[in-house]
């Protein structure tokens, strides 16, 4: 997985969306990140570790290529605005889900 800066992440995410426009999917995950690079041991906890500030870890993949970035709390507003504009521009190919009516469900149950 490639850890990128915020601006580079947004440009690579745009490329992923363009590549998967006709067929394919892009999966995006967002989670809290405390700065650790190694997993926490099961039996004991590391008591001396204190995160300096709150951070978010964003990951994106198309199944083949993975990209990620870490956004600090200081730059989250700027990143969120650019990220939301990118999502609005690239999520135009979504299809509405077919919802079955209640009457069809009740007929099938009888």
UniProtKB/Swiss-Prot annotation:
Residues 90-110 are annotated as: Disordered. It holds the Pfam family SRP14. One of its GO terms (biological process) is protein targeting to ER. GO terms for molecular function: 7S RNA binding; endoplasmic reticulum signal peptide binding. One of its GO terms (cellular component) is signal recognition particle, endoplasmic reticulum targeting. The modification Phosphoserine is found at residue 45. It comes from the Eukaryota. Keywords: Cytoplasm, Phosphoprotein, Ribonucleoprotein, RNA-binding, Signal recognition particle. Residues 96-110 have a biased composition (Basic residues). Heterodimer with SRP9; binds RNA as heterodimer. Component of a signal recognition particle (SRP) complex that consists of a 7SL RNA molecule of 300 nucleotides and six protein subunits: SRP72, SRP68, SRP54, SRP19, SRP14 and SRP9. Belongs to the SRP14 family. Component of the signal recognition particle (SRP) complex, a ribonucleoprotein complex that mediates the cotranslational targeting of secretory and membrane proteins to the endoplasmic reticulum (ER). SRP9 together with SRP14 and the Alu portion of the SRP RNA, constitutes the elongation arrest domain of SRP. The complex of SRP9 and SRP14 is required for SRP RNA binding. This is Signal recognition particle 14 kDa protein.
């Amino acid at each position: 997985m490639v850890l990128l800066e915020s601006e580079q992440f947004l440009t690579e995410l745009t490329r992923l969306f363009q590549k998967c426009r006709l067929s394919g999917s892009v999966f995006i995950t967002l989670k809290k990140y405390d700065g650790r690079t190694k997993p926490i041991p099961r039996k004991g906890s590391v008591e001396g570790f204190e995160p300096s500030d709150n951070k978010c870890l964003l990951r994106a993949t198309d199944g083949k290529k993975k990209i990620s970035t870490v956004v600090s709390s200081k730059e989250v507003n700027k990143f969120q605005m650019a990220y939301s504009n990118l999502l609005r521009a690239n999520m135009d190919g979504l299809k509405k889900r077919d919802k079955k009516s209640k009457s069809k469900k009740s007929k099938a149950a009888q």
